[in-house]
From Swiss-Prot:
The organism of origin for this protein: Haloarcula marismortui (strain ATCC 43049 / DSM 3752 / JCM 8966 / VKM B-1809) (Halobacterium marismortui)
Record-given protein name: Large ribosomal subunit protein eL42
Tagged with keyword Zinc-finger: yes
Family label: Belongs to the eukaryotic ribosomal protein eL42 family.
Entry's transmembrane regions: none
GO cellular component, one term: ribosome
Keywords: Metal-binding, Ribonucleoprotein, Ribosomal protein, RNA-binding, rRNA-binding, tRNA-binding, Zinc, Zinc-finger
Gene Ontology MF term list: large ribosomal subunit rRNA binding; structural constituent of ribosome; tRNA binding; zinc ion binding
Residues involved in Zn(2+) binding: C11, C14, C71, C74
Cofactor(s) recorded in Swiss-Prot or TrEMBL: Zn(2+)
């Protein structure tokens, strides 16, 4: 799917329409200290593993877009709900 890199849209911080630049959100670093990771570590041992004994489900064929819209006027960014797209390319 083709999408323009810059376009006019509403900025919730300026409370008016401004030109925004679109960028893909990069995932942050994962940590092993999340509650689910600690629970998995606690429950691993002898006996039934409960919900961890189930086979994890597979991936969907397409992923939802994860985009950040940065305002050209105030410089603040906001997120919006994504949609399913096989491939997302930006037009200059």
């Amino acid at each position: 799917m083709q999408m323009p890199r810059r376009f006019n849209t509403y900025c919730p911080h300026c409370n008016e329409h401004q030109e925004h630049e679109v960028e893909k959100v990069r995932s942050g670093r994962q940590t092993g200290m999340k509650w689910i990771d600690r629970q998995r570590e606690r429950n691993s041992g002898i006996g039934n593993d409960g919900k961890f004994s189930k086979v994890p489900g597979g991936d969907k064929p397409t992923k939802k877009t994860d985009l950040k819209y940065r305002c050209g006027e105030c410089g603040k960014a906001h997120l919006r709900e994504g949609w399913r797209a096989g491939r997302l390319e930006f037009q200059e």
